[in-house]
Amino acid sequence: MIETPAAAVISDKLAPKVDFFSVGTNDLIQYTLACDRQNSQVERFCDNHHEAVLRLIEYAAGNAHSHGKWIGICGELAADTTLTERFLRMEIDEFSVSPSFILRLREKVRSLNLSE
């Protein structure tokens, strides 16, 4: 699991030792941005679209693929269809979402033209 910034940063070293990566986006956001969605004093710092988080995911994806491994994402970001195209361009291989989000995610994927 890539759930901490440290794991993402050393994903080039982890990739040869694992079968795949799964990015736990809820924890990755909290640990990267020093925020807590369940603490009203710091929840405002949680930004699901923060560039630092997205770059860590992209970096881990590149390292996974350079070692012939697949990478999936889970957590709230996996179901966020405003990020689906970006994740597909990162070559994220799998989206792990709750059943209630499957149809919406499938429709989003089908609507995209990634060859543009």
Predicted segment positions?
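Conserved alpha/beta-domain cores
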Residues: 1-116
